[in-house]
Each structure stands twice: as C-alpha cells, then as structure tokens.
C-alpha cells in the first residue's frame, strides 16, 4: 500500500508558506482544494504537524494555517518525521525459522541495509528546508498557474 502522508504534508506546508509569502490566508478547505485531497485527511495530517510546531492553526471564522517557525528553520526531514512517525521506510519480513544460511541471516541483513538507506534518505531531507523547496518550486514553475489556488480569489469575492 502506498503511503501519501509525506508528499501530502510537504505540499500542505509549501502551500501554507506560499500563502504567507503572498499575504493570503490558508485554511484546511483551501489546502484540500489545492491538493485535491479529502479535507479530513488534511485535518488528520495537521495534528502531527501542529504538535511538532511545523504549522500553527487558528480557529474561528477568520482562522488560518501558518508556519510554526521560519521557513528556513523547517527541514523536509522535520515534516517527514512528523507525519510518518516511527514507520520504517521498508518493513522487513518477520524472522523466519533458520533452515539454511540464508534464512538464518536474511532478516538481520535486510534490516541493516534498510536502516542505512533510511538514514541516507533522512540526511538528504535534512539538507532541504521549506524555504529552499519553495524557492526551487517557484523557480522551476512553467505551469502558468496562480501562486495560490483560485479558491482564495473566490473566497475573497464572497467576503
């Protein structure tokens, strides 16, 4: 089963950062619209992101979602660890009976390789911040899309 928590959380945080840069509001409804995701999934991901100080959410009619600290102080590793928590990158098979040299040693060997790969991935994510990721996205953009979802413009017209 594919796990979309990290890429969705990354897009949420980048969207909130973009909205902040533009002086616009960001809400769970706006994020859900921009991500074409279920609003309940967005709210579920907001829990660990808020707990870990990555985002701050204010309630009420004018409530919004903001970054919990400066964009250059939030790494992609922070976001990943927040939403993935203790789930391993790759799950190893349960220990199997030792019937030959391979079955006696494959589990520990796989775990050591998986741990090394996971650490390498975390090191890469630690080198990227929300600020650098947002700058890269903006610099590479050729979509012609508005910086924030058009839902914000519709929201402004209604209020």
Predicted ranges, named:
Residues 71-96, 114-119:
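Conserved segment of winged-helix/HTH DNA-binding domains
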Residues 25-36:
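A short alpha-helical element within helix-turn-helix/winged-helix DNA-binding domains
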Residues 1-13:
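Short alpha-helical segments that sit at the start of domains
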Residues 52-68:
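Beta-hairpin "wing" of winged helix-turn-helix
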Residues 45-52:
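Basic amphipathic alpha-helical segments that dock to polyanions
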